[in-house]
Regions:
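C-terminal region of N-terminal signal peptides and the immediate post-cleavage residues
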Residues: 7, 16-31
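Beta-strand-enriched cores of mature, soluble protein domains
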Residues: 26-155
Length: 155
């Protein structure tokens, strides 16, 4: 009888642990090996007349494959000037044929940055990860977006 009473708390602990794990795992991205997508943005609409803290820059540009030959989608978003002549804080969506990827990232006037992938649609639904934003040319007319994805179907 004593042995049976000692097993009851153990069984209850296992059941509660199982329930907690299942409840917290619901709708979480399924992390697999990950996926990297590399596109090149042609920044043709990024213009601002007066540069001042708090100013908003909006954009809508085409994105090309990693060889910079074929158009594979577009992007749109906005940036707010945070530090004059130095940095912006940006939010944008990149539209590809199989879904969208949304990013929140700083943008530096004079160097590469890294941002957070905050979600997506289609194939990129539930995706998370990070994105490298690199100057493709020194003039800032083209930028490499390298998405490092995990989570979501097939990622």
């Amino acid at each position: 009888m004593k042995r049976a009473l000692l097993l009851v708390p153990l069984v209850v602990a296992v059941v509660v642990g199982f329930a907690v794990v299942n409840a917290t795992a619901k709708d979480k991205p399924k992390v697999k090996h990950g996926n990297t997508i590399h596109v090149i943005e042609h920044a043709t609409t990024d213009t601002i007349d007066v540069d001042a803290v708090g100013h908003v820059l909006t954009f809508a540009n085409d994105v090309f494959d990693s060889a910079d030959h074929a158009k594979v989608g577009s992007d749109q978003g906005y940036c707010v000037r945070i530090v004059l002549h130095h940095s912006w804080e940006c939010n944008w969506t990149t539209f590809l044929h199989d879904g969208q990827i949304t990013v929140e990232a700083p943008f530096s006037d004079d160097g590469n940055t890294v941002g957070a992938i905050t979600g997506g649609t289609g194939t990129y639904r539930n995706a998370r990860g990070w994105m490298e934003l690199k100057y493709h040319d020194p003039q800032g007319h083209e930028f490499d977006f390298v998405f490092h994805l995990h989570g979501g179907p097939g990622h």
